[in-house]
Amino acid sequence: MSFNPAAGLLGKLKKLWNDTKNDYLEWERSQQGQISESVVKNHSPSKRKRRPSKEPSLSPKRRKNILNDQKKDEESIPNAGTQSQNFTHLSASKIRISDEDRIKPLVDLNQDHSFDMAYLTPASAPPPRFRFVPPKSDAKSHSAPRSLEGVTSLSDSHFNSLEANLKAISKDSNNKAHNNRYDESSLTNPEFSILVERLKSIEENLQSLQERISHCERSVSLSPSFAPPSNVKSPVQQHRSFVSSSARAKKNWGRQSNSPNSNKKTDHAYPGASMNTERGLIQNLEDSDDIHEESSDTLEEPLLINELNRTSFLNSNNNLKLNEAEENQNLLNLRSPKSSGKADNLTIKSSSNIDKVTSNDLYLDNNLQSHFKVTESQPTNLGRKEYSNSPFSIRARKDAATTSSSFESYHNTQTIQSPMKFTKATPLKDNESASVDESKVNVLSENQSLQADTATLEQLTPIPKARWNQLANKHPSLSNSAASPPVSSPGLRRSHIPVHEGLKHTRDGVAETKDALAKLREKMQERLKNHTS
């Protein structure tokens, strides 16, 4: 049987630790004026033998917490004038006042309103065993502020205790005996009013932000992020943000109903019933005053306002014929020339292919007259001196075509006579206008003209810029390379740089990279030499 010298060493260490700890606790209690008691179960430093204990044993952590609470309660009695919340842990049997503490003036607890501040006590604190009720004050000056009405359900006594406690805190903030964990959250009266004002300003800012968000949601369709880039001309942009035909019809209908000769039955009818004829619809749409009013009320984009000022469609002639709109509609249905400029014969699309029209087929060059002129052996009078691609003229012709009563039968029975030929023209001078020459235009006659189905225009929606760049790369005619200078958008920049310039940029970039690498290598070698030396 071998002898183990370490046997029982752990038990001896535990016993020594318990003895030392109990000695210290008894000395601490004797300093506080309390009766010394044995803390550890069945153990006393004076008597080493075991004895049964009636009280249940407590864990060291729980025992330490109890002692700390007692110590805090005793230390907080002389400082009762400050904002100490530790009175909620006290009872009358625990209050012990030493002789040196009797010299200090004690605060009358009936006048201290901090005990009514239930919402200022920490959440982990136990409920108070008693509460001092303050006397009711007749003065109404300490009523609750209006900003707190509806927020808390506290009585007037709570608000009186709040302001009294805040005043006591502001008075005694300079002469505090020790740090308290509630010092940081203490507020004086001006600070409280500043916080209330800040809350009001924050609520106002939130309200204004909410209004801005709703305004942005309403005007998201007019946002420039849904418009095509400036170098690409959209077939949908000229219909995108104008007032719909139903809104214009309501406006014109209200104007007719207010006239003295208007019939009372039309006031309750459909707004477009008073414009059932094609000629009346075109006259109402081409009223210049009406269009200017709607543009000033509804349009805010400067580009569209410049387009209004630039178009020659707003003239004084309001009595246009339907055949002129049909002839101009035929010009809209011509296929746009490809970017190579080699297309000579452009034919009008038949009715069977209208449903398959894509954005490339509906593309219309706004500067058509400045690049091409129409030539034919048999000239006919167009009937108008000017031709415009403005959004209003396109809308008027579209509405006239869609509201025609005999559209389907007329559309299916007509045939195409002769294609129109386009040749390259010289650029216009400053004093010339972009108008169609009457002697060089041959359009189908009134009985043989062909209307286009514009229902696909209604289904087109605004396209984002990134999608437009992809479409322009796939369809070169969308980029309008024949009319515009080289563009600066990132999606089309690569296709407009010549080959020799691209090679030159590449060579320059390689040379600069080599120089930078050589300089970097020299610097690294110098640093290495300095480091080693």
Curated annotation (Swiss-Prot):
* Sequence ranges of Basic and acidic residues compositional bias: 498-510
Q: Can you tell which superkingdom this protein's organism belongs to? A: Eukaryota
Mainly resides where? Answer: nucleus
Localization: Nucleus
Q: Where is the composition biased (Polar residues)?
A: 30-43, 79-91, 231-247, 254-263
Q: Which GO terms describe its biological process?
A: centromere clustering at the mitotic interphase nuclear envelope; mitotic sister chromatid segregation
Region ranges (Disordered): 30-92, 221-274, 475-510
Using the record's annotations, give every residue carrying the modification Phosphoserine.
Answer: S336
Keyword list, A-Z: Nucleus, Phosphoprotein
Q: Does the keyword Ribosomal protein apply?
A: no
A molecular function (GO) held by this record is:
protein-macromolecule adaptor activity
What Gene Ontology terms describe where this protein resides (cellular component)?
A: condensed chromosome, centromeric region; meiotic spindle pole body; mitotic spindle pole; mitotic spindle pole body; nuclear envelope; nucleus
Q: Which stretches does UniProt call biased (Low complexity)?
A: 476-490
The answer, when asked if Disulfide bond is one of the entry's keywords, is no
Name this protein carries in UniProt: Uncharacterized protein C2G2.14
